[in-house]
UniProtKB/Swiss-Prot annotation:
Residue ranges, annotated region (Binding to RNA-directed RNA polymerase L): 216-232
Segments of this protein annotated with the region Binding to monomeric RNA-free nucleoprotein: 1-30
Biased amino acid composition, Polar residues: 55-78, 213-223
Keyword terms of this UniProt record: Host cytoplasm, Phosphoprotein, Viral RNA replication, Virion
Region spans: Binding to the N-RNA complex: 232-241
Protein name per its UniProtKB record: Phosphoprotein
Pfam families linked: Pneumo_phosprot
Region of interest called Oligomerization and binding to RNA-directed RNA polymerase L, as start-end residue ranges on this chain: 120-160
The gene coding this protein: P
Chain segments carrying region Binding to host phosphatase PP1: 81-87
The organism of origin for this protein: Ovine respiratory syncytial virus (strain WSU 83-1578) (ORSV)
Cellular component annotations (GO), alphabetically ordered: host cell cytoplasm; virion component
């Protein structure tokens, strides 16, 4: 005959089940597990807020830890870490106005090697001729800049006034240039005419004077006579001259 497990009913079955669960619980648990349950690690983090202008941030971390594997009762231990400090090396673009200017300057010099008309020797040449030529070029550029600024000043008065002002300025500039050219031409013409008259007079004198003798005027003749006679008693008056 087959054997069957005994059947339990009522309180007897409940008691047997409770004892069976307690026996299983004792097999799977140990004293170390109970000690680990009592071990507590807590980490407290404290953030210190500084003013916005300060580039330094600091934080302290406190760790309280009890003994885990020791058999003695756990005692609270506090470990204090050194503050973590971080420095902000670079300023934002908004706070550094020279960043954009510096980049544009570097790009200008990097891209200007082929377009530049000045060589290294020419720039470092300190002779008078080179300095004079460079000053002339600078003067020319400054004159152009002054002209453009004058045009902008006139143009800033308004659309209609700007158009009329620019036209009047150009007309006035043209008239001034024409007047200067005309005066220079007249002065040159007068000089040419004066030179032509002197040349004609010299030609006429040379045509009339065919001899090599030198003629003295009346005053020179009187002085010559006095010197030849060597007469100191002979006084001269202003009328003789």
């Amino acid at each position: 005959m087959e054997k069957f497990a005994p059947e339990f009913h009522g309180e007897d079955a409940n008691t047997k089940a409770t004892k069976f669960l307690e026996s299983l619980k004792g097999k799977f648990t140990s004293s170390k597990d109970s000690k680990k349950k009592d071990s507590i690690i807590s980490v407290n983090s404290i953030d210190i807020e500084l003013p916005k202008e300060s580039p330094i941030t600091s934080a302290n971390h406190n760790i309280s830890q009890s003994g885990e594997n020791s058999d003695t009762p756990a005692t609270n231990q506090v470990h204090t870490r050194k503050p973590l400090v971080s420095f902000r090396e670079e300023l934002p673009t908004s706070e550094n106005p020279f960043t954009k200017l510096y980049k544009e300057t570097i790009e200008t010099f990097d891209n200007n090697e082929e377009e530049s008309s000045y060589s290294y020797d020419e720039i470092n040449d300190q002779t008078n001729d080179n300095i004079t030529a460079r000053l002339d070029r600078i003067d020319e550029k400054l004159s152009e800049i002054i002209g453009m600024l004058h045009t902008l000043v006139v143009a800033s008065a308004g659309p209609t006034a700007a158009r009329d002002g620019i036209r009047d300025a150009m007309v006035g500039l043209r008239e001034e240039m024409i007047e200067k050219i005309r005066s220079e031409a007249l002065m040159t013409n007068d000089r040419l005419e004066a030179m032509a008259r002197l040349r004609n007079e010299e030609s006429e004198k040379m045509a009339k004077d065919t001899s090599d003798d030198v003629n003295l005027n009346s005053t020179s003749e009187k002085l010559n006579t006095i010197l030849e006679e060597d007469n100191s008693d002979n006084d001269l008056s202003l009328e003789d001259f």
